[in-house]
Every structure is written in structure tokens, then in C-alpha cells.
Amino acid sequence: MNKLNSNAVVSLNEVSDSELDTILGGNRWWQGVVPTVSYECRMNSWQHVFTCC
């Protein structure tokens, strides 16, 4: 297990911060959080759609 972890650390050292942000999705306009319909429902911005009738 220690050998696996040290290999992971060595691999991460080769990746720059900007490349890591791209891989993890942190450099997108939504800051790594993908806006979904369920997220919007929790935030009540879609409430009028579901309660209009």
C-alpha cells in the first residue's frame, strides 16, 4: 500500500496546478460544480415550474 501511495505522489508532482485544475474541473466557469436541474430545484429557482398549477 505504501508503494502505491508513493507512486501516486510522484505522479502528482509531475502535474502542474493548472493541469490538475483542468483534470478536476476547477477551471471551468462554474468552479468545478456542475449545475444540474436537481441543484436548481434545491435552490428554488425552478420552483415556479413545478408549482404553477
UniProtKB/Swiss-Prot annotation:
Changing C41A: Loss of activity. One of its GO terms (cellular component) is extracellular region. The keyword Cell membrane does not apply. Changing E19K: Reduced protein production to about 75% of wild-type level. Thermostable. Changing I23D: No mature protein is produced. Changing V15 to I/A: No loss of activity or protein production. Residues 1-26 form a propeptide. One of its GO terms (molecular function) is signaling receptor binding. It holds the Pfam family L_biotic_typeA. Changing E14K: Reduced protein production to about 10% of wild-type level. Maturation of lantibiotics involves the enzymatic conversion of Thr, and Ser into dehydrated AA and the formation of thioether bonds with cysteine. This is followed by membrane translocation and cleavage of the modified precursor. The modification 2,3-didehydrobutyrine is found at T51. Changing C52A: Loss of activity. Stable from pH 2.0 to 4.0. Activity decreases gradually with increasing pH. InterPro entries: Lantibiotic_typ-A_Lactobact. GO terms for biological process: amino acid transport; defense response to Gram-negative bacterium; defense response to Gram-positive bacterium; killing of cells of another organism; regulation of membrane potential. Keywords: Antibiotic, Antimicrobial, Bacteriocin, Lantibiotic, Thioether bond. There is a cross-link at T36-C41 (Beta-methyllanthionine (Thr-Cys)). There is a cross-link at S38-C52, S45-C53 (Lanthionine (Ser-Cys)). Lanthionine-containing peptide antibiotic (lantibiotic) active on Gram-positive bacteria including M.luteus, S.aureus, Streptococcus, P.micros, P.acidilactici, C.sporogenes, C.diphtheriae, A.viscosus, G.vaginalis, P.acnes, L.monocytogenes and M.smegmatis, and Gram-negative bacteria including C.jejuni, H.pylori and N.gonorrhoeae. Transiently and partially depolarizes the transmembrane electrical potential and pH gradient of susceptible cells, inhibits the uptake of amino acids and depletes the intracellular ATP pool. Belongs to the type A lantibiotic family. This is Lantibiotic mutacin-2. It comes from Streptococcus mutans. The gene is mutA.
